[in-house]
């Protein structure tokens, strides 16, 4: 999040469209732009009212109002370390410029969380628990679109498990197979078996009753809790940003997703998993039935499925080498990953 390059001044070197956009942002947010610079998918904006983060939103106002309401709910419940939106002159959390939506929030000075640093990982785990606690009781604003994945994961796991086999068929039908196809075909059985195991464990767990509890408690999850959305501020406080994917969800999804993001960077070291769970539990202890759902999430081969899905359905325009490197990275983790799964299973008394 630190600004390393020279910041371009507002008044020079701009196209007409950029100048009109900035004029509208100034007008709608009642600010004066002094400097503006692209930075990792957003804009660093220096204004007469302080440093800001300007972001173009790629979804509609109904979803944006859900995200805005979620952040305001957290702040109201004492969880203030989020990138809250400034309101425009009409009291709305966005500017509308040529059918594009822009949000404006404070620029948080700090660094991205280092997932190889176990102390920073513990801080992030504790902050996630605080977020989940503060999320309780969220009623979305009027005219917002309620987003929810509650109850969907048994269906999603089964569907994605079957998709692994379907994509093998797609690879086999190719007359000219590329290296990715060959690697995928060779390894898919292992990941297909993991998907079957994970789906069975989830179906035999208390997943649905946990979803009912989450629905009754009106909780939500961040749904993209990863290093670049966890900022260690210059004040050593932990800030959470980018709630674009937040939705109604059981907390074990966020925990499992966070754990996977960390563990793949530390060779699936069980100590990091224990550190995350222990730190989370100091704020809001997990119950026995939640460990079973957590285990199912950790077991499901989400990364392998997602990569293959992107490849066979052309979801991203990466080159062949990028796809090959990514699938090889996943496969090369297989031994350490399975060792971790057995250790987790033993440590937290899981079966299946």
Whereabouts are the PLM-identified features?
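ATP/Mg2+ or Mg2+-diphosphate-binding catalytic cores
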Residues: 165, 304-352
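Juxta-kinase regulatory segment immediately upstream of eukaryotic protein kinase catalytic domains
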Residues: 2-3, 7-30
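ATP-dependent phospho-/nucleotidyl transfer catalytic cores
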Residues: 55, 113, 142-220, 325
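Active-site activation/catalytic loop segments of kinase-like enzymes and analogous catalytic loops
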Residues: 252-285, 298-321
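ATP-binding pocket architecture of kinase catalytic cores
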Residues: 50-146
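ATP-binding glycine-rich phosphate-binding loop
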Residues: 23-46
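A glycine-centered beta->alpha junction motif in the catalytic cores
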Residues: 102-115, 166-173, 300-318
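Active-site acidic catalytic loop and adjacent metal/ATP-binding pocket
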Residues: 42-46, 85, 200-251
């Amino acid at each position: 999040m630190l600004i390393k390059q020279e910041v371009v001044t507002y008044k020079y070197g701009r196209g007409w469209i950029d100048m009109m956009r900035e004029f509208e942002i100034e007008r709608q947010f009642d600010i004066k732009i002094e400097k503006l610079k692209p930075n990792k998918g957003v804009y660093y904006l220096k204004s007469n009212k302080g440093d800001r983060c300007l972001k173009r939103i790629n979804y509609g106002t109904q979803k944006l109002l859900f995200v805005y309401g979620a952040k305001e709910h957290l702040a109201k419940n004492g969880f203030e370390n989020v990138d809250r939106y400034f309101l425009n002159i009409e009291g709305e959390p966005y500017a509308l410029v040529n059918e594009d939506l822009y949000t404006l929030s404070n620029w948080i000075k700090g660094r991205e969380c280092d997932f190889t640093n176990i102390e920073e990982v513990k801080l992030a785990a504790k902050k996630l628990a605080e977020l989940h606690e503060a999320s309780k009781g969220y009623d979305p604003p009027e005219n917002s679109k309620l987003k929810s994945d509650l109850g969907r994961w048994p269906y999603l796991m089964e569907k994605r498990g079957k998709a692994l086999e379907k994509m093998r068929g797609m690879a086999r039908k190719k007359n000219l197979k590329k290296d990715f196809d060959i690697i995928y075909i060779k390894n898919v059985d292992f990941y297909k078996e993991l998907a079957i195991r994970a789906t069975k464990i989830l179906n035999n767990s208390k997943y649905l009753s946990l979803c009912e509890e989450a629905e009754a408690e009106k909780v939500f999850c961040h749904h993209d809790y990863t290093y670049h959305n966890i900022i260690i501020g210059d004040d050593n406080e932990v800030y959470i940003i980018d709630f674009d994917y937040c939705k109604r969800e059981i907390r074990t999804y966020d925990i499992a997703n966070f754990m996977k993001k960390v563990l793949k960077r530390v060779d699936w070291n069980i100590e990091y998993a224990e550190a995350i769970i222990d730190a989370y539990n100091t704020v809001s202890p997990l119950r026995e039935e939640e460990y079973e759902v957590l285990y199912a999430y950790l077991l499901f081969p989400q990364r392998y499925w997602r990569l293959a899905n992107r490849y066979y359905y052309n979801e991203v325009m990466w080159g062949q080498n990028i796809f090959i490197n990514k699938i090889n990275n996943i496969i090369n983790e297989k031994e350490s990953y399975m060792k971790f799964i057995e250790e987790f299973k033993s440590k937290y008394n899981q079966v299946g």
